Amino acid sequence: MQNSFSLEEFIEEIFNIEKYEQKVKSAKLKNELLNNNIVENRITITDIDLMSGVQFEEFLCEYFNGQGYQCSTTKASGDQGNDLIAKKGELTIAIQAKCYSGIVGNHAVMEAVAGMKYYSANRCMVITNSTFSKSAVELAKANGVILWDRQVLTEKLNEV
């Protein structure tokens, strides 16, 4: 018995093969992009701008864990001015995270200093996706508080 195809069936079969080949090419390209283009998976400052405060804290904790720290979030209320504690060897950093659209003022710096003492940390930081007021920068300098503003945070994101 001989298989016979009509011209229409033959054309349809060729069309199906071409569709299948296109799907394979698309899948290969997608896989190549995902495996070779790590930049596509990076978090950008724009992504951070869309985060909630809690998401920003969780992101920062993951960032510090990736830098070799053991980082944990503090309890949401009564955190004594800090959102994260990052430890690496003898170094303990109390971190205040501010995911804001406005300017971060003195209060965040004061909270970081208070939290550093409360958590017996060696250092303290305030990290924001925004900017700091001039007086916050002066207060931080006088108290040894490390400040990461939008520019520094963007640089850190590009290093990862």
Q: Which stretches of residues belong to each language-model region?
A:
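Mixed-charge (Asp/Glu-Lys/Arg
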Residues: 1-160
